């Protein structure tokens, strides 16, 4: 069985759910069921050379849910795609999170790093989910997390909703309640989370947000520097991390 492939997906819906954030649902009975939590889909955008990497928010009954933010011309074109269109997608890509039975996980998402935490939460038992946004206009997926049975904590940078502060403020208070942490979001946030986990002696898995080209580890466009055992080397975000 193939781990990934390029195929056409039927666009079922593409709706705006927050300021500049869209919820796209595409159907392909062969590839959608292969997606694991923390993986991503590489979406071809007409008139653009490079695909757009979008994290898998959910996968159920042959339908991939892709929640994305409009940041440039490519995602702007994506937001204008209509129901019934055929979407060219390379999926599923990336390693994803490794979830073990018997562990309680803390899942942390910042901004557009929140969507992949929903599918991850559905694979966990009673997860603690901490979501962070700049303000109330960018808040997404709160009801979805509650339906998934998560203990949910909302934070905003400006205090316009939920707790006024950062996700790390909540993590410091609750890290003793969990066995492991999984996180996705801006790099400074991930660094801060990793530092908290290191101090508490808790394992931590992170999913980086980087610009990508091939999505399979060949072109090195998304390479970042990270420590491997005892030395620093380049890792491909799409394939290694």
Regions found by a protein language model. Name each.
Residues 73-211:
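FNR/FR-type flavoprotein reductase catalytic core
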Residues 231-234, 238-241:
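Single conserved hydrophobic/aromatic residue that forms the stacking wall/gate
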Residues 2-85:
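Ferredoxin-reductase
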Residues 210-233:
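Local cysteine-cluster metal-coordination motifs and their immediate loop/turn environment
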Residues 21, 35-37, 99-101, 216-217:
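Short glycine/proline-enriched turns and hinge-like loops at secondary-structure junctions
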């Amino acid at each position: 069985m193939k781990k990934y492939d390029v195929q056409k997906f039927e666009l079922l819906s593409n709706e705006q759910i927050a300021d500049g954030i869209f919820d796209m649902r595409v159907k392909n009975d062969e590839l959608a069921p292969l997606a694991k939590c923390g993986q991503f889909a590489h979406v071809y955008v007409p008139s653009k050379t490079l695909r757009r990497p979008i994290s898998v928010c959910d996968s159920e009954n042959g339908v991939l849910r892709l929640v994305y933010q409009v940041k440039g011309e490519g995602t702007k074109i994506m937001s204008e795609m209509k129901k019934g269109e055929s979407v060219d997608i390379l999926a599923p890509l990336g390693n994803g999170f490794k979830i073990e039975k018997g562990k309680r996980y803390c899942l942390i998402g910042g901004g557009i790093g929140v969507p992949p935490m929903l599918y991850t939460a559905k694979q966990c038992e009673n997860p603690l989910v901490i979501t962070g946004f700049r303000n109330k206009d960018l808040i997404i997926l709160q009801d979805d997390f509650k339906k998934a049975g998560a203990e949910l904590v909302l934070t905003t940078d400006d205090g316009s909703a939920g707790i006024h502060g950062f996700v790390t403020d909540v993590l410091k208070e609750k890290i003793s309640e969990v066995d492991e942490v999984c996180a996705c979001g801006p790099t400074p946030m991930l660094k801060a989370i990793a530092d908290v986990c290191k101090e508490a002696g808790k394992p931590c898995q992170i999913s980086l947000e980087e610009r990508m080209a091939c999505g399979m580890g060949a072109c090195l466009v998304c390479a970042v520097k990270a420590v491997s055992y005892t030395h620093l080397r380049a890792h491909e975000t799409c394939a290694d991390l």
